[in-house]
Structure formats: structure tokens, C-alpha cells
Amino acid sequence: MVDLEATSTGSKAKIIQVGIVVIEDGKIVDHYTTDVNPHEPLDAHIKELTGLTDQRLAQAPDFSQVARKIFDLVEDGIFVAHNVQFDANLLAENLFFEGYELRNPRVDTVELAQVFFPELEKYSLPILCRELGIPLKHAHTALSDAQATAELLLFLREKMAQLPKGLLERLLEMADALLYESYLVIEEIYRNQSILNSSDLVQVQGLYFKKTGATLEPRKLSQDFSKNISLLNLEVRERQESFAKEVGLLLKDEPVSLIQAPTGIGKTYGYLLPALSQMKERQIVLSVPTKILQNQIMEEEGKRLEEVFHIDIHSLKGPQNYLKLDAFYRSLQENDENRLFRRFKMQLLVWLTETETGDLDEIGQLYRYQHFLADLRHDGNLSSQSLFMTEDFWKRSQERAQTCKLLVTNHAYLVTRLEDNPEFVSDRLLIIDEVQKILLALENLLQETHDIQSIIDLLDKALLEEQNKVQQRILESIRFECLYLIEQFQSGKSKKNILDSLANLHQYFSELKVEGFEELVRYFTAEGDYWLETTETSQKKIQISSTKSGRILLSSLVPESCQVLGVSATLEISQRVSLADLLGYPEAKFVKIEAGKKQDQEVVLVKDFPLVTETSLEVYAKEVADLLMDVQAFQQPILVLFTSKDMLLAVSDLLPVSHLAQYKNGDVHQLKKRFEKGEQQILLGAASFWEGVDFSSHPFVIQVVPRLPFQNPQEPLTKKINQELNQEGKNAFYDYQLPMAIIRLKQALGRSMRREHQRSLTLILDRRIVGKRYGKQIVASLAKEASVTTIAQSEVNEAIDRFLNEL
């Protein structure tokens, strides 16, 4: 095992420290370390990273003085390193200049870890050590890193030894996807492996699956909420208990009810425990706004309920979230030339021995493989000729959904399923958490989206087959307009050009008579609004979307036999606009648990920050970035909540320090985990970060809101509701848009108030909150829940310092 510390990671790097650990027969038998004099001063960040100093290295030997010793240690072995390319190449180069040729086989523990621990999101040595419980006392010290790499290799060997010999054989067949000679480790374990299969696995068509465990007999919950909480080893909280009591009363008496309660009181247990204790015969369906929260509930509250009360809990998502085994099996028969895809298939083979659900979200770096996943995702169809009829994950999930006691899903899947089959929730209790968010999910049912590049691909195919010259010209014209749309959208040029192009598409499609284009003809010739957007995946596809007129009410999808409980921290919109009305339940019972002012939360309004509506994006982003640099000096977690992707990316580009940014560093779930683990101090987020992600691990969080979260009046749902309210003689801004902005701000405050004694300070930089008439309404509402102060920008550091000293 070799680890080098160097002056840089570039081609001119010089070795400053060497660490070597020797393994024989699965045991560490020797180790060696030495500093090396690079004869040049170290950069400040290298000193900070390694703890080495120029003075110390000045006393160290030259590499020529230790080269023989190093070569003797590594000459006859396999060269193993974490990111072997850097260490092996640098050492080989330095040894070559001293007359020694390093030609050892090379093994990279990074790639092996990626294959055999597919659920991890990061594979740096410190993170792997933390996740696997490997000691790493002094990261970026050569010997310490080499020892940790040795322990990691032993851990990997142990993991491989637990796998069936047949699986190792298949992995070896694909091991040319690994760099260098990393396959040697798998080969050694394979040679020594017995043919006996694990009793925990079942083999089907050469694939190995984890056997499903038997469902435990559920334990009876008490009617006393405090007893159930105590059994979960949690403290009883007064407001949580009050909330649970109200939920219990609503479940006894009300067919449809809405309950509002403040963040941070433990609402999830507050509604689940009363529901589970009362609904002895009926299934409970819980819907949450996002898949992230769905996963979070399964990993946290759901896991505890299973452990303590043996509740049969299942998470149900759309079919595309699951691996389609028939498609994966076919891909294994193909000799794919893409090395990354072959390695991904190796990961999937290992993952199949561990997963019980087949939910692709379990794979840590899934975003890296989006290009390969289109053909592997489940489409919801299962052929009667399937080789995996029993093991099919989507089929299993559907069956579990019918029999489990508590079914957890998300708003998007819920409304889609209800549209197809309202009986999905018949005679069940439906709990909708963050119920106001289901309005957007309902609106999305009316939207239709097409990928422009996919349309172009379809046109190219049709042009090769179409014989009619007139129709050929129409196809060519449509293709030109599609390419023009992409060009105009990417360049950010005149909106008029895009509108003209859409009008041309409307005309061309109305004249198109080619078979296979009927759906697109209907789509482009229908009356309605269209808009272009970029997908938030690694492929950045440009899509065109449209929406139908009118709104779908939740009440129109849910059968009367279903009892409905809507929950949120923010249900009240305004005196003249009711969420119950917007959902189609004007008679719903409404209960409110008063929030009360939180002593651990402060909102700070910056009265002299540049006015966002009169400042260019570039200038405003620079001001925000400069402020963040001042705030980061306090060494506290900073969550920045943006209303615009463009602003977020502009600030990210200007920040000179390492940070996490949505749209750049993985999906929301991964960013949340990395931020909670303290990988980076600053997280820039938008969209789901306002209301769909909770942060509970940090005792103190600084939140920054660069712009008030008003909804875009051109968004389809907002536009429709505004039109409805105007027709009813109401003021769309004061009765809906302003209250919704206040709701979103309150939800933002709740992101970092998830448990008792957690503290947060929120900086609102948009000075409209102190300069506009409506700002008083926002401040008055926030002041009911947190301390609100107004300061100058020059006083920000002082305000943070004061708040920190109160900890």
C-alpha cells in the first residue's frame, strides 16, 4: 500500500512524504515512512493539508537517498493505492531518475470501492473510512493514509469473500472495465472461494438476489401518545402531544380535515402514532411532497416504527424509479464498449445482493449514470414471458402496497395514480403532509412535456422513410424550427424569435399528415401556453411544455370512502383565500396549533443591501458572494436559499471558497447528506430546499435569503389561480401571492428548526421587506414566530457574533 504527499497534483509535483504498508497473506506485516526534501517552498494550502513545514522538509533526505529502500519494499508486490494513477506514476517517475524501473501491477481501491460499495455517494479516503469504520488518525499524512488504504483493501477482500463464487466469476468476466490490474484482487478471492452459496441469497438466471425477510407480527400501540413516544426512546414534547391529541380527535370524527402546526415539534410522529393506534383495520397512505422526504421518512421515522412496533411499512414510487431486471439481464448479454457502463453493471450486480426494493435511488452516484439508465428503468409493464416474474421489483412493490399497514408515497405519484385509479385510496386513511404542495402536483397532471432532441430524432427517422415530397418539406421545416428553438433558448436571445418559431411549428404541424406524428400534431396545434425549460439532469435536455386550461381539484380524484387528513406548518393563506377551497373541500374541518415565538430563531433584515429589482444579476450576485465570504468566517453552516437558478449559479461562480451548489454537485438528496455530514460549510439551494429538505444535524445554521420568494406570475398554476381570484373580485397579489411568499419564508425558517434547542439566524437581503408597504405585512407575520431585527449591512457580522455568543 503506497501513499504519497506531494507539492501539488499536477505534472510538476514533487514528492514530500512517502508512506508504505506491506500486506502478506491478508495481514499487515511491515510499514515505512519518510519525509522527502523537495528543495522548494510549499504552498500554504499544502502546509495546511499535510501539516508539513518548509523547516521540517529542509532537514529531510533527498529522494535519491531513500529511493533504494522504497524500491526494495515495492519491487515484488502489487502496487495498491487510493487513486493509484497519481501515486504510481509519480513514484515511478522519481524512481526512474534514480535508475529503478517500477513495473508492478497496479490496483486502485477507489474503483474497487465504487463497485463493492455501490450505495455510497463519495469515495474519498476520509469518507470511506468514516462510512466503513476504518481508523484514519491523520488524513493527508502519508503513512496514516497508506495504513487506511491497507485496511480498506482488507475490508474490500472481506466483502468480496461474502459473495457467491458465481457472482465473482461474472464480475471477473467484466473486470476489464476496471483500470489497471484491479481485477487481481477479485481473482484472488475467486480462486479461494468455495462454491457454497449464501443462505441469504437466491440465484435466478445468473443474478443473485437478497431473500425477502418474513414480516414480523405487529405490536399493539397504546392509545396514550406519550407511552408510544417513550417506547421510541424519545422525549415527550408538550406541543407535539397537543398536536397528536388534535389529530386523534380529527381521525375519530372528520371525513376531511386540515391541521396546521409549527415546524420543529415532531409532526411526523405526531400524526403517524395516533393514526396507527386508531386505524386497526384500515391501511394508512402517507403522501409527502418529494421523493427526498419519502426516503427520509423511510430511513428515520419509518425505520424506528418497524424496529419498535413491527409496523409493516412500504415506500411506493413510480415504476421508473425501479430497475427492470429483464432489461438489465439483456444488457449483460451485450458486449458494451463503454467502460463506465460496464463498471456500472458490475455495481448493479453487487447491489442486487443487498437491495430489498430495487429502488435505484439507493445507488449513491446514480447521477453519473443517467445516460445509461433510460433502457434499464422499469416502464411499469411486465411481460408474461419475463425471466424474473417473481423477483420483478415493480411487481413486488405493487404487491407490498396492497398489504402493508403504512404506505409511504409522494405527491407526484399519488395524483398520477389517483387519476388512473381512484380506488387506490378507497376505504383508506390518506394523510397528506405539506398538503399545500399537492396543488402543484395536480397542476402537473395538466401539463404535457416533450424533449426537443427526441422530436428531432423522430423527424430524422421519418425523413429517411417519407416518399411524399410535400410532407418531406414540412418535416424539414419542423426540424429547422426545433433546432432554431434550441439555439435561441441556449443563447438567451430574443423571446420574440422563440415565439415566432413556436407559431411556425403550430402552422407546420397543422399541415403534417405523416403516420406516427398524431400525438405531436395534437400537441402543437392545441391552443394554450408553451414554455421552454432545461432538465436538471446531467444531460441538460431542453424540453417544451404546455398546460391545459382549468384546474384539477383533489376532491375530484379522491373517493368519498377515503378519509383525508391534510397537514402542514403553513395552511392559512389569507382571509379571503382558503386552501380548503383550492383543494375542493370547502367544508373541511380546520384546526390550528399556535406556533408561538421561537427563542432560538432570529430573522435579520438588511435594510441597505442593493435593491434587487434595480440591480443587474451580475452585480447583485457579486454583492451576495461578498457577503457570504464575510459570513463564512464564523465557521458555521450556511444555507443560502435562492428563488432563481441563474442567481444561484452566478453566485456559485463568484464564490472563491469550496462549497456545495444545486445543479452542480449532485441531486438534492446527495447535497443534503453532504451538507449534514459537514463536507462543506456553504450550501446554495433553490426549489426543494425551501420546503422539501430538513436539516437537523447542525446545532446552529445561518440561512441567507437573497430575494423574497414571490411566485413567478407566469407559472401556470399561479397564473390560473390569479385569474380565478380576479374573476371573483379578489386581489390576486394581496390575497394570494403575498401570503404564499410569507408561507414560503416561514417554511424556509423551518428547514433548520427540526428539533429542540436547534438555533438558526436568517438574513433576508431583499430590502423590499423594509421599503415596500407590503413588507410590513411580511415582518408582522414573521415576528409572530421569531425575533425580527433590522440592521445595516455593516452590522451583519456584529449581529451574527452576538447571536453566537448567546449559544
Please give the residue ranges for each predicted region.
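Conserved non-catalytic scaffold segment of RNase H-like nuclease domains
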Residues: V2-N104, P118-L136, H140
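Acidic, Mg2+-coordinating catalytic module of metal-dependent nucleases/exonucleases
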Residues: E75-Q85, N89-N94, S124-I186, T762-I764
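A substrate-engagement module of RecA-like helicase motors
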Residues: S226, R282, K291-C404
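Walker A/P-loop
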Residues: K252-L273
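Signature of the SF2 helicase/ATPase Hel1-core->accessory helical subdomain module
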Residues: G380-L406, H411-F509, L571-L583, Q714
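A contiguous, basic/glycine-rich beta-loop/short-helix subdomain that forms a polymer-engagement track
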Residues: G380-Q402, N421, Q507-T615, V619, ...
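Conserved motor-coupling elements within RecA-like helicase/translocase cores
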Residues: Q398-C404, H659-L683
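Conserved RecA-like P-loop NTPase helicase motor core
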Residues: D608-S616, L671-D766
